[in-house]
């Protein structure tokens, strides 16, 4: 359930908190800071806003509406689960707020601590020769595509 809730936070609708996969900051459209600016992210095609506060060095972030996130993620939550998720998400937001205060300007970017970044494997496509065994194990197969049952209802 926590993973689904986190995914819902990432891809929730506007006016909710977002965790950007490419940055370590939590970004929000609803916060109590004095200045906001909005930035359109074309690859993800959803709005992300950064919030800055001139009063303090960290932004005050509002927790998301968990009931709406559950509806967006198409999961059903009881009121007790909603309350539990709200407290967990609030703790995560507070934790990321602490991370925003860390100065990382002097830290060199690295893939891993023990690697220098030059010994990664080449990203080359590979052909799988035993396609017939895969086709035999799949119940519904049409041309080059797998047929799977519909799992989401369009409402």
Curated annotation (Swiss-Prot):
* Transit pept. (range): 1-52
Q: Does the keyword Cell wall biogenesis/degradation apply?
A: no
Q: Where is the signal peptide?
A: none
One cellular-component annotation, GO = mitochondrion
EC number, as in UniProt: 6.3.5.-
> Which InterPro entries does the annotation name?
Asp/Glu-ADT_sf_sub_c (IPR036113), GatC (IPR003837)
Give GO MF terms, alphabetically. Answer: ATP binding; glutaminyl-tRNA synthase (glutamine-hydrolyzing) activity
Q: Which domain of life is it from?
A: Eukaryota
Q: Which GO biological process entries does UniProt record here?
A: glutaminyl-tRNAGln biosynthesis via transamidation; mitochondrial translation; regulation of translational fidelity
**Which catalysed reactions does the entry list for this protein?**
L-glutamyl-tRNA(Gln) + L-glutamine + ATP + H2O = L-glutaminyl-tRNA(Gln) + L-glutamate + ADP + phosphate + H(+)
- Localization of this protein: Mitochondrion; Plastid, Chloroplast
Q: Does the keyword ATP-binding apply?
A: yes
Swiss-Prot/TrEMBL keywords: ATP-binding, Chloroplast, Ligase, Mitochondrion, Nucleotide-binding, Plastid, Protein biosynthesis, Transit peptide
Mainly localized where? mitochondrion
Q: What's this protein's family per the entry? A: Belongs to the GatC family.
**Assembly state and interactors?**
Subunit of the heterotrimeric GatCAB amidotransferase (AdT) complex, composed of A, B and C subunits.
Summarize the protein's role. Answer: Allows the formation of correctly charged Gln-tRNA(Gln) through the transamidation of misacylated Glu-tRNA(Gln) in chloroplasts and mitochondria. The reaction takes place in the presence of glutamine and ATP through an activated gamma-phospho-Glu-tRNA(Gln).
Recorded hits in NCBIfam families, A to Z, give:
gatC
**Matching PANTHER family:** GLUTAMYL-TRNA(GLN) AMIDOTRANSFERASE SUBUNIT C, MITOCHONDRIAL
Q: What is this protein called?
A: Glutamyl-tRNA(Gln) amidotransferase subunit C, chloroplastic/mitochondrial
> Source gene?
GATC
């Amino acid at each position: 359930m926590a993973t689904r809730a986190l995914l819902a936070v990432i891809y929730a609708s506007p006016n909710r908190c977002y965790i950007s996969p490419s940055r370590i900051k939590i970004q929000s459209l609803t916060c109590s800071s004095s200045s906001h600016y909005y930035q359109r992210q074309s690859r993800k095609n959803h709005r992300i806003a950064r919030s800055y506060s001139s009063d303090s060095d960290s932004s005050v972030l509002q927790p998301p509406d968990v009931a709406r996130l559950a509806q967006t993620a198409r999961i059903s939550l009881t009121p007790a689960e909603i309350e539990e998720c709200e407290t967990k998400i609030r703790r995560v937001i507070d934790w990321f707020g602490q991370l925003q205060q860390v100065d990382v300007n002097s830290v060199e970017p690295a893939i891993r601590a023990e690697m220098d970044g030059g010994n990664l494997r080449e990203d080359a496509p590979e052909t799988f020769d035993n396609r017939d065994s895969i086709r035999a194990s799949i119940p519904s197969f049409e041309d080059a595509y797998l047929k799977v049952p519909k799992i989401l209802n369009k409402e």
